[in-house]
Amino acid sequence: MTFNHKSIDELHDLLVNKEVSALELTKATLEDIKEREETVGSFITVTQEEALAQAAAIDEKGIDADNVMSGIPLAVKDNISTKNILTTAASKMLYNYKPIFDATSVEKLYGRDMIIVGKTNMDEFAMGGSTENSYFKLTKNAWNQEKVAGGSSGGSATAVASGQVRLSLGSDTGGSIRQPAAFNGVVGIKPTYGRVSRFGLIAFGSSLDQIGPFSQTVKENAQLLNVISGNDKKDSTSSQVKVPDFTQFIGKDIKGMKIALPKEYIGQGIDEKVKETILKAAKHLESLGAIVEEVSLPHSKYGVAVYYIIASSEASSNLQRFDGIRYGYRTDDYENLDDVYVNTRSEGFGEEVKRRIMLGTFSLSSGYYDAYFKKAGQVRTLIMEDFKKVFANYDLILGPTAPTVAYDLDSQHQDPVAMYLADLLTIPVNLAGLPGISIPAGFVEGLPVGMQLIGKPFAEQTIYQAAAAFEASTDYHKQQPVIFGGGN
């Protein structure tokens, strides 16, 4: 028996009314994972034993009727720490690493009686946009297994899109939730920087990283963000802004809502058919009563360059801790301490990670710091100012999530610049610390197109309101890939 076509609300009703137990639901989810895993490759680790034990304990205690997430299984990206469960960040460097603590977001899942059924595949240390940079395996697009899943949270996206799980967590540093959500036709949000604790997230770019949910629908996404949000004393960057009920405005109309469409988001470098799809989506929002007007974000064109200086610099610092001494991989080939460091890191890190460490080390070096890192920080401020000016007059900004639909496997893997440019539309949102969601907005040649809605800081409720209004009046989210029983 499978339950993967049922919403979280429907599953909650079944659990509360004892029509199904948490154990039965978890067993069915594990079957769904097993059945589809060879096709898509979403998981690095499936936590069958732990999940079944947890489900049995929840049944013993009883489902909480007031907690919609009680007994619900989900998957978690493999750079989010899970106590005594392999957490590899898809790297040889951490091939055997089992944390001795849970990330705050994981603690919050357990606190609401959610069941983690596995850890999902990703680009190594979240560096990449296709999930082809994993040390362990390749993840394939749920709609077409000859296409990339997107990245870096590719496994979390395909797990939801293929019907292995209903919900998952990913992380987003420059588009790593939104872009794979777009490529796989699911909902994915990068919350405002500081909305969700980063404690226990294996760090890549500390001023950019944020954990967020993937889901089949907008409401389910909001329901999961309700669980993981909030201030955390263990993360000094987590915000003290009060956490509202993110589902509160779902179902309300968007009459009079002002939405900005930046000309840069539908200009050069954007696939013509993707652009047409987004313009059609903008017209649809207008038909629902929103006011959509063209604006300019003039400095967004520098986003990719700024990001690859700042993110790589932060990564080169964060990844210094992986040296073969305390945990993780250690080389067998050494005669002295220098050899341990050099050979461990040379053998343990993949090509893309090494590339970014070198980029970051270069831009932080004494002769180049002012010319690169400092200047990137100044341009980042200009990008933030652009957003601030637009948000003085508008509620939301809309555009495509990615410039193209999912591309062929191995077609950009050897061309890092082409891969970097694929994050053209998502990166500025991270640089400015803003919330941004990707929702299904149409198809091009049988592949999903994502629409990105960007909000003011901590205005996730407004994003969900508009996203839900669009979703309720279209059927893109109802169309499923063949692997999930759909016709596409």
UniProtKB/Swiss-Prot annotation:
One of its GO terms (biological process) is translation. It catalyses: L-glutamyl-tRNA(Gln) + L-glutamine + ATP + H2O = L-glutaminyl-tRNA(Gln) + L-glutamate + ADP + phosphate + H(+). Its EC number is 6.3.5.7. Transmembrane segments: none annotated. The active site is at K77, S152, S176. Keywords: ATP-binding, Ligase, Nucleotide-binding, Protein biosynthesis. Pfam families: Amidase (PF01425). It comes from the Bacteria. GO terms for cellular component: glutamyl-tRNA(Gln) amidotransferase complex. GO terms for molecular function: ATP binding; glutaminyl-tRNA synthase (glutamine-hydrolyzing) activity. PROSITE patterns: AMIDASES (PS00571). The keyword ATP-binding applies. HAMAP family: GatA (MF_00120). Heterotrimer of A, B and C subunits. Belongs to the amidase family. GatA subfamily. Allows the formation of correctly charged Gln-tRNA(Gln) through the transamidation of misacylated Glu-tRNA(Gln) in organisms which lack glutaminyl-tRNA synthetase. The reaction takes place in the presence of glutamine and ATP through an activated gamma-phospho-Glu-tRNA(Gln). This is Glutamyl-tRNA(Gln) amidotransferase subunit A. The gene is gatA.
